Amino acid sequence: MAVQISETVRPFANFSPNPSLWGDQFINHKSKTQQISRIYLEEIEGLKNEVKCMLTSTPEGKMADTVNLIDTLERLGVSYHFEKEIEEKMKHLFNLIKADNYKDHEGCDLYTDALHFRLFRQHGYPISSGIFNKWMDGNGKFKESIKSDAKGLLSLYEACCLRTHGDTLLDEALVFATASLKSMAANLASPLRKQVEHALFQHLHFGIPRVEARHFITFYEEEEHKNEMLLRFAKLDFNALQALHKEELSEISKWWKDLDLISKLPYARDRVVESYFWAVGVYYQPKYSRARIMLTKTIAMTAILDDTYDSYGTLEELDVLTKAIERWDIKEINGLPEYIKGFYKQVLKLYQQLEEELAKEGRSYAVYYAIEACKELARSYAVEAKWFKKGYLPGFEEYLINSLVTSTAGYLNIISFFGVESVTKEDFEWFSKKPRIAVATQIITRVIDDIATYEVEKEKGQSATGIDCYMKEHGVSKEKAMQRFYEMSTNAWKDINEEGLSWPSSFSRDIFVQLRNFSRMVDVTYGKNEDGYSKPEKILKPLIIALFVDQIKL
């Protein structure tokens, strides 16, 4: 029997609708993939071969030229075509500098030192931050001579984000480079001024690769010594990949419209386009097309589940819903409140479809791990709902244990592994045990989200926010609590950076890149003290337009 409540009092009776910004814009997209293929495919392939020749034929003694080329390819967003060649080059170059004990760097300028440091660490090579010692004076301060080196300081600024827990010099370097760049930015000439201003707004290492590529193509076009062939290749490739993304977004948008869940659940956020943007942030390459579709559908459905627990369901209704999710059986639908029956049915249907899809390649076992994570998520959502309803303020540790689960990072990262064929059953087992890098992604998601949503949650009357729990337990101000949350995020990023240098490892490089990209999505979506997912107008809308609406002019 369905739950009957004579006089229902909703948690937020004055909830406001959360309509989509996009309407049917992407449903009505007419694919231009075939047209682009006919006109540009041959040229793209030809340019790709030219770039490959450039990459493989760089002289042995010109390390700086090789590293600059690799960095340019990565920042233009085309390096995915040359992963094998780039890794071979990076491995060879790192072995050279290690054998030479970094002596080759003694004559390098700051820009080159910092670029090499960043590139090697990005690729998992443990280059020492000691290469920056030569830029310090006898008092342990950075030399005055580099304070006017804008290009070098920008390179140092970006390199600092790859620091680990032992890199105290880079903690100081980040403060120094940030202050120096801020003081000189307005007086720089473009395109360097634009690059500095963008970097101060969004760190490269914490940015979304596809978004950063779109920005860099614009910057590179203004460079005096640009390579015209590389620029055209990047533009053509961006437009071709954009066409594929539009096709996927059209397919997903049609699926979402056919479900018609939002009309029945007006309290829920209609964010399927933003969910797809998130999936592209995790992996944008053509080979992950199916993975993006799987992840997008799950993110959009998870937002509805979150809103049901957070903004609409009563404790009695949520108790029934939690038990139904725990039992994971369509028969449970009969006991659910009427408004949520359709949603519950579609969740089970989605998982059945995912299982059938994965069964084709003998990987249906993956669904078990996602279902278990979904059950854990529902239980933790229920705990938060009880805290709010009863006005209970938990201790910070109690809050954090539960809220790391409700960050959804663990659950959604499991889903993100579905479409990656290299991920094995052993990888799912490893991840389910909450290894260090998994916890780091959860911490980043939790604390950055908590900072961004604090004021909105307080307006709703929410007392058990992470900030409030920390303030009460430690007797500090809101500002001090937020500062501590930023420190937790910084330390979690250092954990991720350290895990990226631990090769060979118990998990694959593909998994590492996905987890790092997931954390980057958090920084972009919530890192400017705004909830970009719930209120996408300011943060996500312009990025979505840049990636999925506007082509690059050739």
Curated annotation (Swiss-Prot):
Where does this protein act, in terms of pathway? Secondary metabolite biosynthesis; terpenoid biosynthesis
Highest taxon listed in the record's lineage: Eukaryota
CDD domains linked to this entry: Terpene_cyclase_plant_C1
Which residues are listed for Mg(2+) 2 binding in this entry?
306, 310
Question: Where is it mainly found?
Answer: cytoplasm
> Which cofactors?
Mg(2+)
| Documented EC number(s) | 4.2.3.23
Pfam families, from UniProt?
Answer: Terpene_synth, Terpene_synth_C
GO BP field: diterpenoid biosynthetic process; farnesyl diphosphate metabolic process; sesquiterpene biosynthetic process
Name the UniProt record assigns to this protein: Germacrene A synthase
Q: What lineage does the source organism belong to? A: Eukaryota, Viridiplantae, Streptophyta, Embryophyta, Tracheophyta
